[in-house]
Amino acid sequence: MSLDIVILAAGQGTRMRSALPKVLHPVAGNSMLGHVIHSARQLQPQGIHVVIGHGAEQVRERLAAEDLNFVMQDKQLGTGHAVAQALPAITADTVLVLYGDVPLIEVETLQRLLAKVSEQQLGLLTVTLQDPTGYGRIVRDAAGNVTAIVEHKDASEAQKAIKEGNTGILAMPAARLADWMGRLSNNNAQGEYYLTDVIAMAVADGLVVATEQPHDPMEVQGANDRRQLSELERHYQLREGRRLMAQGVTLRDPARFDVRGEVTVGRDVLIDINVILEGKVVIEDDVQIGPNCVIKDSTLRKGVVIKANSHIEGAVMGEGSDAGPFARLRPGSVLEAKAHVGNFVELKNAHLGEGAKAGHLTYLGDAEIGARTNIGAGTITCNYDGANKFRTVMGEDVFIGSNNSLVAPVEIQAGATTAAGSTITQTVEAGQLGVARARQRNIEGWKRPEKIKKS
């Protein structure tokens, strides 16, 4: 079965009160539309057609890197009209209609829905709710067969009592779609062309409407305002938390933990409260992450420990290495096994060899640091001259005294030592002591200044 997917994303979202198109508002670091596209891709369709309208250029720009067919809906005349705009591009056997503001839909749910579709059968995703206000109602005959969908504004009081609502997500044989689209009418309370009217047409044409339901009603929850958006965010985070815990992660409090990207985890991982994982993050076995940390686009090897209030971005931390508290690893930072980065240490494009240590109050930028080298407190690599950046190279077993300024480009060779308070501008050769500071003078009879008395 070949598949085309149509995603409706033309709505304005006035209740969001935002210049940003509704479907671009984020859930877990990705736009709502981005989540829907991600799920759609996993179904391996031959085409994904995104119907856009309000904020069309913003949507195109945000998703320019995706392989999508954008279809313009100049006037928002209803869901049926929106799908009709995509008709010329549809060539597959089956069409699946999704919504750009329903980001939590599970791939497994869509697979079950698609399994219902045949030449003589549609698949319709419905949801049973205690309060289905706003949802179109699923009307069934005495035998339980779906006969129609009635929109809430057009429903009678008896129909409004029905608890089964229409999610809007449906799959159908493409060969029938063009005929049904041509027969749609806008004779309703909204004056719009409802996609849901194809259900009654299908029944009249002798097709069966087979229904499927999501395991969790939140899968089909949309977001029309900021409150609903926050509800989607929290539900997504709790769902991701459950997934990680099932894989061997201990979360101190799943309600105070956020995933905003793609996370791969090992076993016996411990994550404390208020931790944010962004982008592509790989966490191997036995890693411990303290509270209030952000980990972005990074790899944490087995046994890594990250202490409280640390920010790790674009970094690789080797087996048994540690960072923090209050450490910052910026893009290009690599810690080999058992390397240590302590409190108030910042790394940028720096490579620390096995067992190297930078314990506190240090900036290491554009630096190559050999195994077992020790960096004293207050050390700074002066890597930028206002126009270009330069590297600092330290060999193995180097000892850098406290309060050093290492003016790049500069090399401190294996086994060398620099004295505390030095400004190193030249090579310190292997085994040498580098001292670069003014000689101390003690002045006899010196008196401190006294405050001038006011008259």
UniProtKB/Swiss-Prot annotation:
Binds 1 Mg(2+) ion per subunit. Residues 227-247 are annotated as: Linker. One of its GO terms (cellular component) is membrane. Residues 248-455 are annotated as: N-acetyltransferase. Pathway: Nucleotide-sugar biosynthesis; UDP-N-acetyl-alpha-D-glucosamine biosynthesis; N-acetyl-alpha-D-glucosamine 1-phosphate from alpha-D-glucosamine 6-phosphate (route II): step 2/2; Nucleotide-sugar biosynthesis; UDP-N-acetyl-alpha-D-glucosamine biosynthesis; UDP-N-acetyl-alpha-D-glucosamine from N-acetyl-alpha-D-glucosamine 1-phosphate: step 1/1; Bacterial outer membrane biogenesis; LPS lipid A biosynthesis. GO terms for biological process: cell morphogenesis; cell wall organization; lipid A biosynthetic process; peptidoglycan biosynthetic process; regulation of cell shape; UDP-N-acetylglucosamine biosynthetic process. Keywords: Acyltransferase, Cell shape, Cell wall biogenesis/degradation, Cytoplasm, Magnesium, Metal-binding, Multifunctional enzyme, Nucleotidyltransferase, Peptidoglycan synthesis, Repeat, Transferase. Its cofactor is Mg(2+). One of its GO terms (molecular function) is magnesium ion binding. It is found in: Cytoplasm. Its EC number is 2.7.7.23, 2.3.1.157. Residues 1-226 are annotated as: Pyrophosphorylase. It catalyses: alpha-D-glucosamine 1-phosphate + acetyl-CoA = N-acetyl-alpha-D-glucosamine 1-phosphate + CoA + H(+); N-acetyl-alpha-D-glucosamine 1-phosphate + UTP + H(+) = UDP-N-acetyl-alpha-D-glucosamine + diphosphate. In the N-terminal section; belongs to the N-acetylglucosamine-1-phosphate uridyltransferase family. Homotrimer. PANTHER family: BIFUNCTIONAL PROTEIN GLMU, NUCLEOTIDYL TRANSFERASE. This is Bifunctional protein GlmU. It comes from Pseudomonas entomophila (strain L48). The gene is glmU.
